[in-house]
C-alpha cells in the first residue's frame, strides 16, 4: 500500500511517497521558505500560502519523474489538515482533494502533530513498541503524551504559555540575532567562553505536574541582557548557552518525571527542537543511566516534512480512516 503525503502547514512545502507494506520511504521532496521569511524575522502567512501554490505541483512532477511511479500506483493521498496556518493548510488540502478527484484516489486528513509523533519510525532501525511516552517539542507546541496504541494519545502535560521552540525564536529576537531561532541560539551557545557567567531560572522544573512554562525564561533573558553593560558577542554567546541549558534542563526533567509517573521505559522525541544536539545528548544520558529507550527522528525529519505525513497517513488508512467527501476542513488549532 503506497501513500502520497503532502505537508503545507507553515513554511515548508513537502511531498513524499511511503510504502507501508515495505515500511519504506520511496521518495521525499522538500522546499523550505526560510530564506523568504528570514528578512521579516518570522513567517508571513500570506507569503507562505503563495509559495505553497507555486511549489506543490512542481514538487509533485519531480517526485513522480524521479521514482518512475504514476498516480495509478498511489492508494491514498494524505495531507496535513491541522493545526497550522489556515491559508497554507487550505492550499495543501485543496491540492490533495483535487488530485484525489481527478485520479479517483482516496484522500485522508492527517493531524500535523501525529505526523511528528510517528516520525522516528522513518528511521529504519527504529522498532518502537507500545506503550511509550512522547515529547512533541517545536515552535508551536511543547506537549507530553502517553501513547498506548496508534491513535490512543493521552495528554500528560503541556506548556501553559510559550512553546520551547517559540522561546528559542523570541530569544534570538531579543538578542538581535537571526531566524530561525533554534539554530542561531545553538550555534552561538557552542561559542560560549564563560559557561557559568549567567544563571537563569528553570520555570516549573520542580513542580510535581508535567506542564511547562518558558515565558519567564524568555523574560529573564531580556532582563539579563538589558542590565548587561558589556553586550559583546562573547557575552551574547554566554547568555545563549545559559538559556539553552535552562530550557533543555526543564525538558529532560519533565520527560524523566513522565516516564516515572507512567512506568514506561520508552520515550519518543519529535518536533523541530528534537534536532537540538544538547537535548539529544542529555536524553541519551538519561536513557543510559536509567535503562530507558530513547527514539529520535532522523535529523532531516525533525522539522516539517512530507515524509511524516505520508507515514501517518498510511497508518491511518490501514486503520480504516479516510475522507468521506470533498469538503475542505482545516483548522488553525486542534488538540491531538
Swiss-Prot record:
GO function terms (MF aspect): iron ion binding; N(6)-L-threonylcarbamoyladenine synthase activity
Keyword annotations of the record: Acyltransferase, Cytoplasm, Iron, Metal-binding, Transferase, tRNA processing
Statement: the UniProt record of this protein carries the keyword Iron: yes
Pfam family, one: TsaD
Location in or out of the cell: Cytoplasm
Cofactor note: Binds 1 Fe(2+) ion per subunit.
Entry GO CC: cytoplasm
Main location: cytoplasm
Residues noted as binding Fe cation in the record, renumbered to the chain: 112, 116, 304
EC assignment: 2.3.1.234
Catalysed transformations (reactions): L-threonylcarbamoyladenylate + adenosine(37) in tRNA = N(6)-L-threonylcarbamoyladenosine(37) in tRNA + AMP + H(+)
UniProt xrefs under CDD domains: ASKHA_NBD_TsaD_bac
Co-factor requirement: Fe(2+)
Signal peptide interval: none
EC class (word): transferase
Record flagged with keyword Membrane: no
InterPro entries associated with the record: ATPase_NBD, Gcp-like_dom, KAE1/TsaD, TsaD
Annotated binding of substrate, by residue: 136-140, 169, 182, 276
GO biological process, one term: tRNA threonylcarbamoyladenosine modification
Family (UniProt): Belongs to the KAE1 / TsaD family.
HAMAP family, per the entry: TsaD
Protein purpose: Required for the formation of a threonylcarbamoyl group on adenosine at position 37 (t(6)A37) in tRNAs that read codons beginning with adenine. Is involved in the transfer of the threonylcarbamoyl moiety of threonylcarbamoyl-AMP (TC-AMP) to the N6 group of A37, together with TsaE and TsaB. TsaD likely plays a direct catalytic role in this reaction.
Protein name: tRNA N6-adenosine threonylcarbamoyltransferase
